[in-house]
Design a protein with these regions (language model features):
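"A position-specific structural signal for the A-helix of alpha-solenoid helical repeats
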Residues: 17-27, 31, 58-68, 96-106, ...
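Non-cytosolic head/periplasmic domains of membrane-anchored proteins
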Residues: 44-100
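Membrane-proximal, non-transmembrane interface segments of integral membrane proteins
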Residues: 1-69
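Long, non-transmembrane cytosolic or organellar matrix-exposed soluble domains/tails
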Residues: 116-178
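Alpha-helical repeat scaffolds
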Residues: 2-8, 35-47, 74-90, 111-126, ...
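Cytosolic, positively charged, low-complexity intrinsically disordered regions immediately flanking transmembrane
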Residues: 18, 91, 95-99, 111, ...
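Short coil/turn linking the two alpha-helices of tandem helical-hairpin repeats
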Residues: 31-33, 53, 72-76, 108, ...
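Short coil/turn linker motifs that delimit alpha-helical repeat modules in TPR/alpha-solenoid proteins
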Residues: 13-14, 51-55, 92-94, 125-127, ...
Length: 178
């Protein structure tokens, strides 16, 4: 859709839409679990081609997304780099604190293998966020040694879109448990 929109849009928006298209391809790759491809696609976009009024928000979101990708790739050097970038990124409508807390929780659970209750105490804002929160909540419960809660959370997302890596991992866990 973005590709069509970028080609058919008025000239001043065209470059912005093209860059968004590149970034969105990375987000789709992330959701499918292809983290290396996600990193490559998300890193290709040129912030200077984004319409000036959207740059701060785009930088904040892209840094957040790239940090999540690097956490799943277990790339300590890039994790440190994008954490620093996220801390320097300008806030956009008060969303920065939430994104920082979320990435810290993901890093604790996935990279550091430490318990972090963020996903148990925070409410998701939409269905995709609910799936993500259930996935990381299940990993957190697994770190706590709470097999029942882990199973329950994975079961709650196992019937969702099978293309999502959250769902694929939940199914692997449930199949391995039987």
């Amino acid at each position: 859709m973005f590709r069509v929109q970028s080609e058919k849009s008025i000239k001043i928006f065209r470059a912005t839409y093209r860059e968004y298209c590149q970034f969105i391809q990375g987000q789709v790759a992330y959701l499918k679990g292809d983290f290396q491809s996600a990193k490559e696609n998300m890193s290709k976009y040129d912030l200077k081609k984004i319409w000036k009024r959207f740059r701060n928000h785009t930088f904040l979101i892209s840094t957040y997304e790239l940090l999540k990708v690097c956490i799943h790739l277990q790339d300590a050097q890039d994790i440190a780099f994008f954490e620093e970038q996220l801390s320097k990124a300008p806030d956009f409508k008060g969303s920065k604190a939430k994104l920082v807390a979320q990435t810290q929780a993901i890093k604790d659970i996935v990279f550091n293998q430490e318990v972090n209750d963020y996903f148990d105490t925070t409410e998701p804002e939409n269905k995709l966020a609910r799936i993500m929160f259930s996935y990381y909540g299940a990993l957190n419960a697994q770190l706590k040694g709470d097999g029942g809660r882990t199973r329950s959370l994975f079961e709650s997302i196992a019937h969702e879109n099978p293309e999502l890596f959250y769902v694929q991992e939940a199914k692997k866990y449930l199949e391995g448990e039987n």
